[in-house]
């Protein structure tokens, strides 16, 4: 909250990304944020393999596939900030492995799932007894609609947290409406 007669300049994000293919079936991406509110962060560093049509596998540091809004980069946001759900639980990057299948014909959908360390970007040297998982399905009945269902299990410390998310959006030219619901359940092991 600002006080009267206060002001500032801020570079909120200054991202630099390099991506491409080293082979027709092998791609890479590296993305760094040179100014995430003043600090430098490595965001993505992964390799993606496309063994057959519509299927890919990704290994490295990436955004965890969860929620409808989390995969949008700052330049793709509809508002100045992320949605509350994406900001609080969906804006997670981690080191892991994902598989993704995309169906473009008939009833289009995208199904993506992965296993992750669960330690985020900062504590990658830790050893884990439990991996986190995330599964996300996007149903695309036509070009204007998107229904996204996802689930994620994380285990910080000794508490298991299961999250279930459902989101839907409709867009047509300059109109976009979106709604999302998240259910979070805590358990102990």
Residue ranges and their predicted role:
Residues 1-118, 129-131, 137-146:
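Outer membrane beta-barrel
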Residues 22, 119, 181, 185:
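Flexible, active-site-proximal loop/turn residues at the rims of small-molecule/cofactor binding pockets
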Residues 39-41, 66-71, 122-124, 156-160, ...:
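Outer-membrane beta-barrel proteins
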Residues 128, 138-189:
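Detector for outer-membrane/organellar transmembrane beta-barrel domains
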